[in-house]
């Protein structure tokens, strides 16, 4: 047999031997790379850092101080000034007659909180809620399915983000709709006489259209075309899922984080970060807001309590490291670009401040009023007390609480919004009575 014939017969063995050699070389090379980076992890054991974390105790005090009540009165002033007399809906920003389902949910939270704090009596709370529900029932829906992303608070017209009427609409936001649905659940528990009105409202919305395979689905309009897309990232997604669960919707994938979670270490704390991109281009944002809403409105579950503890501790840790008071979340801005996410982790880096479009604007990092009050209500530490002290001086008794303080300049971020003033009220109600889902005695 010739050499060539022997070589042909042996070629399978040669290929196998070469593969084994290459595999050995690859293993040896990988071993030279060392351990994975200590600040990031992903995989099946990603919950382990949170299992090892002791959640901070909640700080429900059982009563309101005189100072608490003064803070609450200032926050309620915003809604006294910004609710349309005809429709009973609240402006999302001071003197700007536009709202979303998210901000309308904030107004509902503000009413329930003001009632618990004794700022308004039960008949006034009932009347305000009844009027708001009636106007929500009168809304022209996007494609006759679900509420549009924005409405004019006086005319109830579908509008764009410039508050200009738009015939087709912008689509619906699954997160925003879930928030108003969740607050309707709070209304049913706290004002059962309004349960029939709530049921009639929600039965008029095709809520099943925003749930598909256990996920939350929103829509966008682009060049006249309507596109459906999964909505929500870790934090906001689970908060919205809890809201939908109040009405029996199967949102198991939205509530589950296991397939989309990675851990980034910030100030030594494990921070829960979504592996999915924001708007398909930018690493996802981690802010305080969804955890504040979850704790103040629904009460933490074990997982969200641990996530919230880590996110809070990272902010406290940044102060210990830099001396800069830190309470970060999403905020309106008093100047362009008018909205930013001050993150614990965002855009692939710690403490990044991001626009919705994914541009970085760290000069607009804000010590957020709502984060200061929210964390103080939930955890009540010496550090959270310092946060409240820092923002207290900027309260406007005639207007409400502003968004906060710009870290870089110390100047006030003078935008005044429904969200911030609602969170202040919810925080102060929580201090005295616990989460809103718990029916007040």
Task: Please describe what each predicted stretch is.
Residues 2-441:
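Ser/Thr/Asn(+Pro)-rich, low-complexity disordered segments
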